[in-house]
Amino acid sequence: MPSTDLLKLKDFEPYLEILEAYSTKAKNYVNGYCTKYEPWQLIAGSVLCTLLVVWVYELIFQPESLWSRFKNKLFRLIRKMPFIGRKIQQQLTKAKKDLVKNMPFLKLDKDYVKTLPAQGLSTAEVLERLKEYSSMDVFWQEGKASGAVYSGEPKLTELLVQAYGEFTWSNPLHPDIFPGLRKLEAEIVRMTCSLFNGGPDSCGCVTSGGTESILMACKAYRDLALEKGIKTPEIVAPESAHAAFDKAAHYFGMKIVRVAQKKNMEVDVRAMKRAISRNTAMLVCSAPQFPHGVIDPIPEVAKLAVKYKIPFHVDACLGGFLIVFMEKAGYPLEKPFDFRVKGVTSISADTHKYGYAPKGSSVVMYSNEKYRKYQFFVDADWQGGIYASPSIAGSRPGGIIAACWAALMHFGENGYVEATKQIIKTARFLKSELENIKNIFILGDPQLSVIALGSNDFDIYRLSNMMSAKGWNFNYLQFPRSIHFCITLVHTRKRVAIQFLKDIRESVTQIMKNPKAKTTGMGAIYGMAQATIDRKMVAEISSVFLDSLYSTDPVTQGNQMNGSPKPR
């Protein structure tokens, strides 16, 4: 009795005969058509067709989308048109001048030092000069600056200065010369991994800041993806994820795929799932994200990471040293965010923010050394010997590492819990009061220290301008148009929060007398930037800001940056 498989095969025999007949007919047609061409023509045609296919493929499949490249090309052509180009250039020049006018930090009444002094200055003279420079700063001690300075407590400052002085000349590039410094750095990493519930295999590195921590994680996953055969590794990140991920994509030849947010400003997990492709090198969430202070749904995204076997980075640069103490401070978070979540493979956390270490220190952590090894750079063939570096920099300031260690040891768990309690208490108070102020609203549901404000009744940038006139400093946000304020230990001091709310209420009341009035100053510049379709023009204008940071040209005296200048 014939088997079932043979019976099934016989059922397809008529179809196979038809297929064979058509293939023979097609073959004969092609052979007949090609008889009028010489062999060299067929070879040349094949080569040209192959080159054309490769060219079309490379044209379409690039890190920058075809639509984006088309728009950029179109805008470049428009700017070259005689009349339109001149008009655009005039507006561009005006925007640059307006930007410079609104850079108060350029308006100093002191001459710039442009050459070395012929005779070196004494210690007293150098310190006196430095006091002159520090007197130009905003008087942030009043608590009117958003973020920027996270403690500033005099006794802590004294400790950090002494710790830095102890290791001023040390460099972790030479662990054989500075073994004590190596021990300090290793202990910083281990303490931080423990705070984020890393297991015995967890590891990390100390970096110069949040951006470098993010860059290092992206570099590690880029190299891992390349090893797997992915030619253009992709970073799948929320729209709200830090711009350092764009920087990493730019530096490392990656492509960033931005994923939409929901109305509550959390990343849309379904949209993130749709964004995953065979080129995805890493997934990203924030805890919290910088613009609105909202924590992304980390456990849900972690499930995607596990399902598709993709590394998953949690960016906790801003609030890392708050979220780990929230539960003990009496403000437990609804969802886990650290290495307890299966699928989380790396975390970045800034010690120089709510860790209260001096600027220039952060930690990037990995769940396992198998990820960290891709972060390292090793050149085994250099004439100067085998060169190995854990992060971007070669030489690094040992003083910063020592001061970071000193801050961690000085605060201890109890100190951080108490600081977190004060900050979150102040933030929750401000949040509850701001929710009751008419004509403004809070974006999302911030659980930590950042509160973003918007308005449906007036240009929210006007509120920032008006608060600036009262000495306050806000951060401008875009898409959607909004502003935010970041609460630190400085803002927990007596009456700072009360004064903040008083000035907000007064400013909103004043604005609502003429809600449609034109926005001026930096608010107008940000408004213009958000409305500009050609983003290359916005980048060109922004470069003026960067150029100005290195300007040594004298500018007429004016006010300092948003905030109260120090008394002279």
UniProtKB/Swiss-Prot annotation:
Which Gene Ontology molecular-function terms are recorded? pyridoxal phosphate binding; sphinganine-1-phosphate aldolase activity
Topological domain spans for side Lumenal? 1-41
Please indicate the ranges of residues that lie on the Cytoplasmic side: 63-568
GO terms, biological process: androgen metabolic process; apoptotic signaling pathway; ceramide metabolic process; estrogen metabolic process; face morphogenesis; fatty acid metabolic process; female gonad development; fibroblast migration
Membrane topology value: Single-pass type III membrane protein
Q: What does the entry list under GO cellular component?
A: endoplasmic reticulum; endoplasmic reticulum membrane
Q: Which residues carry this modification: N6-(pyridoxal phosphate)lysine?
A: 353
Q: Write down which residues bear the modification named N6-acetyllysine.
A: 353
Protein name as catalogued = Sphingosine-1-phosphate lyase 1
Q: Tell me what organism the protein belongs to.
A: Rattus norvegicus
Record lineage: Eukaryota, Metazoa, Chordata, Craniata, Vertebrata
Q: Could you tell me the gene encoding this protein?
A: Sgpl1
